[in-house]
């Protein structure tokens, strides 16, 4: 039986992000790279995570930390609520919420990730995390307060 893609699409993993993670195809844009990186966290694929970071980030130096992070984390879902990129400038941004459970406590990573394209390949560079108050609107666009939505 086929496995659904953890990125949240309705497609099978092998027909969706699995093709990017395996190297069968390159991510056509930053949003697809973000989705494939989320899948790599779910599948505990440190090699792909390192490969998809820009080489100047020296992610291989953090391999042990990446692998240690897999131990107690269960990923619960990804919501991308904004993505923009410029082929002319070879830069892109993806804003997302990645939900997880770690040692029985639920949490979320809310980030605006920055990507760069070099030699036809998109790479993750870094990200910024907004400072949200409990009564701020949730960045996912639900219209709810952060504390009643993704901040739970």
Swiss-Prot record:
Domain of life per record: Bacteria
PANTHER family: ADENYLATE CYCLASE-ASSOCIATED CAP C-TERMINAL DOMAIN-CONTAINING PROTEIN (PTHR33747:SF1), UPF0225 PROTEIN SCO1677 (PTHR33747)
Source species taxonomy: Bacteria, Pseudomonadati, Pseudomonadota, Gammaproteobacteria, Enterobacterales
Organism: Salmonella typhimurium (strain LT2 / SGSC1412 / ATCC 700720)
Name of the protein in its database record: UPF0225 protein YchJ
Family, as annotated: Belongs to the UPF0225 family.
């Amino acid at each position: 039986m086929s496995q659904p893609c953890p990125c949240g699409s309705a497609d099978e993993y092998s027909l969706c992000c699995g093709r990017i993670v395996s190297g069968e195809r390159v991510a056509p844009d930053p949003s697809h790279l973000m989705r494939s990186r989320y899948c790599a966290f779910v599948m505990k694929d440190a090699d792909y995570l390192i490969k998809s970071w820009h080489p100047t980030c020296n992610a291989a130096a953090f391999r042990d930390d990446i692998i240690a992070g897999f131990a107690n984390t269960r990923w619960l879902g990804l919501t991308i609520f904004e993505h923009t990129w410029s082929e002319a400038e070879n830069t892109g941004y993806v804003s997302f919420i990645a939900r997880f459970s770690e040692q029985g406590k639920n949490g979320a990573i809310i980030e605006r990730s920055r990507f760069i394209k070099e030699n036809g390949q998109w790479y993750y560079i870094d990200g910024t995390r907004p400072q949200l108050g409990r009564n701020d609107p949730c960045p996912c666009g639900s219209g709810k307060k952060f504390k009643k939505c993704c901040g739970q």
